[in-house]
Amino acid sequence: MSNVNLTAETYTIPFQGHELHARVFRPSVSAIGRIFYFHGGGLVFGEPDDLPSCYVNLFLNAGYELVSLDYPLAPEQGLAVILEAVHAGVMGMLEILGTCADSTGSSHLPYYLFGRSAGAYLALMEAKRLCGSKSGADGADALSTESTAPAASGSCFTAPSGLLCFYGYHTFDLPEFKKPNAWFTKLPAVSKQTVDSLIQTKNGADDATPAFLTSGPMATRYSIYIYARQNGCWPELLGTPEDIARYSLSEEDFVLLPPGFFTASSGDQDVPFRESKQMARKISGSKFFPVYYLEHDFDRDTSKSEGMQAYQAALAWLKEHETA
């Protein structure tokens, strides 16, 4: 496998008086598809450039453009704003990159939504919105704030062709997310005072307006997530119980979604392994690729072969899906 020069084009998308950012990595040959990537981090930490370069190269060598999108983080921003920002980012980049049909009526690149962990949740929720809109259902009902994304006309709008979901979940309303997590309780306890000191406001301590953060380094933000999992209050950091229920996938939603590639490890200490397995069963045309006895983000350690094997399987699934 050759190493592609990982030089990215950068774009800015306006959103509710703030800025969202996208980085586009292009293959050296004509692209055959486009992949939108959302990072993980429990929606409270993480950065959009966290995908190891060996996996980026794998996509590029296979002929896919990779578009890495950021989004605002919780608890400064709630689920409604986060999901609306994701939609604004996707629609904005579809407009910029010209995924809509051109004047001759021929369609441009098919696109896929890819996320790891919380990023997979965002990919699923955005697919629900996009596919609901395409089918004539009220796909926008999942979000309550006004979008500032460029509007795609009905004549050129295309729904995503598929999903790539690595160790994700379809809801925050899981028993495992609402009680102390055994693995996280083994770590040094994080106090609420520490968490409160890490939550940022727009202009410092004298301003109660929540900050709009689109980057949250693990070194400074991971403690928020540890606290949430140690105390079983992760969903509470993201929104009200009504928000959590609303921003979830139902059995009816699974029918609307495009096929996906799902993978997770049986040794996942963070997110239930069954989530990926069950979603692959419920979404028609999907594939589940199990990994055994490794940690939640099993692809983080690139010295282990399981990560590369999962990405190679994902690419094989993409090829099968394109020719189906």
Which role does the model predict for each range below?
Residues 1-30:
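N-terminal cap/lid segment of alpha/beta-hydrolase-fold proteins
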Residues 45-55, 80, 274:
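The serine-hydrolase catalytic nucleophile loop
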Residues 49-67:
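Short amphipathic alpha-helix adjacent to the substrate-entry channel of hydrolases
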Residues 95-190:
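Primarily recognizes the serine-hydrolase "nucleophile elbow" in alpha/beta-hydrolase
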Residues 166-250:
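Accessory cap/linker subdomain of secreted extracellular hydrolases
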Residues 256, 262-264, 268:
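Short beta-strand/loop motif that positions the catalytic acidic residue
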Residues 269-275:
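Conserved alpha/beta-hydrolase "acid-adjacent" motif
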Residues 294-307:
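Catalytic histidine-centered segment of alpha/beta-hydrolase-like enzymes
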